[in-house]
Each structure stands twice: as C-alpha cells, then as structure tokens.
Swiss-Prot record:
The gene is accD2. The keyword Cytoplasm applies. Acetyl-CoA carboxylase is a heterohexamer composed of biotin carboxyl carrier protein (AccB), biotin carboxylase (AccC) and two subunits each of ACCase subunit alpha (AccA) and ACCase subunit beta (AccD). One of its GO terms (molecular function) is ATP binding. This is Acetyl-coenzyme A carboxylase carboxyl transferase subunit beta 2. Component of the acetyl coenzyme A carboxylase (ACC) complex. Biotin carboxylase (BC) catalyzes the carboxylation of biotin on its carrier protein (BCCP) and then the CO(2) group is transferred by the transcarboxylase to acetyl-CoA to form malonyl-CoA. It comes from Vibrio campbellii (strain ATCC BAA-1116). NCBIfam families: accD. The keyword ATP-binding applies.
C-alpha cells in the first residue's frame, strides 16, 4: 500500500466533527486558571492540585468528608424560612427563598449533623454559601441553637464551618437577633465544659464573623480564606486609606492574633480530632490506611 493509500485509508481518517462535552465535567481554578477534571477535584476536597487553592465546598460535601462514614445523621432539619415581613427589594423574599432552595436543595443556609470524628462523638454544622450567600436568618439561628442543645444533652463537642456574607437583610432585626441568640447558646456550651471549634472558610463576613465564627475555644482558618466584618472596599472608602496587601486573609489574621491556626483541608479531620480529644480527655481512633 502506497503512502497515499495509507493516508486515505478509512481507519486513519481523523473525525473532525465537533463533539459535545456534558456541562460540569471540567472546571477552572479561579486562582491559577488550571483546567481541572470535576470528579478528581471533588475527590481532592475541592483543592486545586496545582496551586493548592481552597475552593468553596457545599455544606453537605464538607460534613460528609469531615465526619466518619456511616456515623452521621442530620439534625434540626425541620425548620423552613418564612417571609413574615413581606419583604421586597428587586424580588420578593419568598421568591429568593424558593430560588435558593431549588438551586441548592437545602431548606436554608445551615446544615447540622451529629456523628463521630475519629471515633469521638461530635455535632458539626456547615454554612451553605450558595444559599443567599450563607446569610444568617432566624432559621439558621434556630438550627444552630438546636445543634448546641443536642451537643449539651449528648455530651458532644461542637464544630462549625462558617461561610457567610452576614445577617440576612430580608429578615431585618430578626436576623440581627440571631447574633445574640447563638452567642448565648455558645456561652451555655462553654459553661458545661464542652469544646467548640470554629473553622472560618472563604468567605466569612458580617454578623456571623462578629458572633459564632469568632467565639470558638479554638478558631481555625483555611488557607487564604477571606475573613472580616465589612468588606475591604467599604473600609477603604470609609477610612480613606489603602489597606495592607493580604488584609482580611486568614494568614494576616493569624499573624495579628485573630486566629489560632491555619489548617489545610486535607488535614482538618486529624487536626480537629486531636484537639477535641485533648479538650475532652478522650482517645481517637487512627485513620485507616
């Protein structure tokens, strides 16, 4: 067979037709712009394997990867938000709730579970940032307080992963009241001698950062997480000064004493398990190889 016949052989003809790739198979790291296979990224706990950028996780993925398998059950799941003020901005609050519930599959912005961490009984909560920016309203407050109550009743440590834009403006003063309500519950937890570990993830701002996120016996930040009360731009416009580079990142807060430590996501189970074991004078079960 001549070279031309080989070239024209049907087995050697390259298919030039466009093929469609299902949406969501690939994604791009927002930090280094590396194209990543979505399934592999999820297995790596939403951490970029090239630059180690910690991306946001859903609340359920976070709790599922954090708690021991087959040792977890959801709690405080009966609450649903209500538009008691008939609030309307560009959309009605009822519409925003319905859209957020449809897009996330959650009733509100906090998921709470009880289970075990390396064999230690704990209660764990995680904010769902995709639900109205993880904003704290009356349902989030009620779920968190019930999680604290269960931790006290069953003698469990408490862990909370924060990712929040602040108090939910559509609930006005009722949202702001949750800062005092949740803080009082944590005071009760402290008085009975149970540990509370707070993990601040990207991003944690507003009323949550001014209450439950900073009230841990130990406050942990994820790498490069943005943490603060007001945003950088708002502060710069108010004080009319340029803020330092890295301002409001977890590394800056650690350097200035606002955080106790920074822990990578892959090491979170081991580190928090060890802390709770020391604070409760219990032994942990080692991770299976």
């Amino acid at each position: 067979m001549s070279w031309l016949e080989k070239l024209l052989d049907k087995n050697n003809i390259i298919n030039t037709r466009k093929t469609s790739i299902p949406e969501g198979v690939w994604t791009k790291c927002p930090s280094c712009e590396q194209v990543l296979y979505r399934i592999a990224l999820k297995e790596n706990l939403e951490v970029c394997p090239k630059c180690n950028h910690h991306m946001r996780m859903t609340a359920r993925d976070r709790l599922d990867s954090f708690l021991d398998k087959e040792k977890q059950s959801e709690i405080a799941c009966e609450y649903e938000p209500k538009d008691v003020l008939n609030f309307k901005d560009k959309k009605r609050y009822k519409e925003r709730i319905a859209l957020a519930q449809k897009s996330t599959g959650e009733k509100d912005a906090l998921v709470a579970m009880k289970g075990e961490l390396l064999g230690l009984p704990i209660v764990a909560c995680a904010f769902e940032f995709s639900f109205m920016a993880g904003s704290m309203g009356s349902v989030v407050g009620a779920k968190f307080v019930e999680a604290v109550d269960i931790a006290i009743e069953e003698n469990r440590g408490l862990v909370c992963f924060s990712a929040c834009g602040g108090a939910r403006m559509q609930e006005s003063l009722m949202a702001l009241m949750q800062m005092a309500k949740t803080s009082a519950a944590l005071d009760h937890l402290s008085r009975v001698g149970l540990p509370y570990i707070s993990v601040l993830t990207d991003q944690t701002f507003g009323g949550v950062s001014a209450s439950i996120a900073m009230m841990g016996d130990i406050n942990i930040g994820e790498p490069e997480a943005r943490i603060g009360f007001a945003g950088r731009r708002v502060i710069e416009q108010t004080v009319r000064e340029k803020l330092p580079d890295g301002f409001q990142q977890s590394e800056f807060l650690l350097e200035h004493g606002a955080l106790d430590m920074i822990v990578e996501r892959s090491d979170m189970r081991r580190k928090i398990g060890g802390l709770i074991a020391k604070l409760t004078n219990k032994s942990i079960q080692p991770e299976a190889e």
